């Protein structure tokens, strides 16, 4: 048994379930497959998300056309936040309303109230219930503004929104950060790739590296890391002494 004083979380996230399942189902994972797993945007029907989303389908929406429309979108949702389905955006919002309570092991919010709150919010912010996920979920920094996919509890993590934007859209402010894949070839040579949401110059807006990784990041791509001195020198843009 676990001591209650250790603070060990016994719940399983969707990320944990999806990561375990995807890696267990592949006996030999290539670097490309591993990176694809990291960028997975799906929800497992064995996760907490299934029971929560099912509870929204149980809401009686008779006499309320907007609630009925939201429920229909939920029913048509394809269990992914890849931006391909017209229900992805509202599904993400519905999941997000319950995610903190689930993480804290608190009672989940009332399904009808959550459905109504989401309908009201989407109607006010976007004028429709089925905006494309990438249209409303944005990665923003400086003058760069890009569509961002992924979800609250997916391996491709976009776990929190900053909703106080002038245009009413949702700026991603929490989720994936620095990601690196390191491997060694048969000769023992290290090969690595990395990416982060914005750029290496994290607090220098005047630098070209303040936002230069954003396009790669939203595309789920990586850049090479020039680890060896000779390789770094070959790709250097400028040489200087601090």
What name fits each language-model region?
Residues 1-242:
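C-terminal/peripheral segments of proteins
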């Amino acid at each position: 048994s676990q001591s209650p004083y250790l603070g060990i979380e016994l719940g399983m996230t969707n990320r944990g379930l999806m990561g375990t399942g995807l890696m267990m189902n592949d006996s030999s994972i290539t670097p490309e497959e591993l990176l694809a797993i990291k960028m997975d945007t799906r929800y497992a029907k064995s996760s907490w998300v299934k029971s929560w989303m099912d509870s929204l389908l149980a809401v009686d929406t008779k006499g309320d056309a907007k609630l009925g429309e939201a429920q229909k979108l939920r029913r048509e949702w394809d269990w992914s936040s890849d931006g391909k389905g017209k229900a992805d955006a509202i599904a993400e919002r519905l999941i997000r309303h319950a995610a903190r309570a689930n993480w804290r092991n608190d009672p989940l919010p009332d399904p009808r109230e959550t459905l109504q709150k989401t309908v009201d919010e989407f109607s006010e912010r976007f004028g429709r219930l089925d905006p494309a996920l990438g249209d409303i979920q944005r990665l923003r920094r400086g003058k760069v503004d890009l569509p961002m996919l992924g979800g609250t509890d997916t391996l491709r993590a976009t776990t929190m929104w900053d909703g106080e934007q002038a245009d009413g859209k949702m700026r991603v402010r929490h989720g994936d950060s620095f990601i690196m894949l390191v491997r060694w070839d048969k000769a023992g040579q290290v090969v690595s790739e990395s990416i982060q949401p914005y750029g290496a110059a994290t607090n220098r807006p005047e630098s070209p590296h303040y936002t230069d990784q954003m396009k790669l990041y939203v595309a789920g791509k990586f850049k090479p890391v020039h680890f060896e001195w000779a390789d770094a020198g070959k790709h250097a843009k400028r040489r200087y002494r601090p």
